Amino acid sequence: MSQVPEDLKYTRNHEWVRVEADGSVTVGITEHAQESLGDLVFVEPPEAGTQVQAEEACAVVESVKAASDVYAPISGEVTQGNEALADNPEAVNTDPYGDGWIMRIQPADTSEIDGLLDAAAYQELVADEG
């Protein structure tokens, strides 16, 4: 079973969400997602200032096997895209919950975070997918 940190929230599309001290959220793809994709060769995070809607595609990750959209887990404004991934996309593979983060969002409505999956529910989702 892939690592699923207890302190994060998750989406059914395999993104993780960490609420930061300033109220913003950091978003990336889960260890399960990066394992399914394989070695990443390209990551295109959204630019700062981009308005995103919950469950809307807003970034792209590409591996040697496939390209996949990354979906905004909540609505809000992107405050930062992880530009370091341009030169080091493999950080998503080696440290998906750390240096491999994809974007930071200032939430439009923090109650959307409450609707995300906790670690136990996400683990159940992954197990059900087989």
Swiss-Prot record:
One of its GO terms (biological process) is glycine decarboxylation via glycine cleavage system. NCBIfam families: gcvH (TIGR00527), PRK01202.1 (NF002270). Keywords: Lipoyl. Residues 24-106 form the Lipoyl-binding domain. InterPro entries: 2-oxoA_DH_lipoyl-BS (IPR003016), Biotin_lipoyl (IPR000089), GCV_H (IPR002930), GCV_H/Fam206 (IPR033753), GCV_H_sub (IPR017453), Single_hybrid_motif (IPR011053). Belongs to the GcvH family. The gene is gcvH. The glycine cleavage system catalyzes the degradation of glycine. The H protein shuttles the methylamine group of glycine from the P protein to the T protein. Transmembrane segments: none annotated. It comes from Halorhodospira halophila (strain DSM 244 / SL1). The modification N6-lipoyllysine is found at K65. GO terms for cellular component: cytosol; glycine cleavage complex. This is Glycine cleavage system H protein. It holds the Pfam family GCV_H.
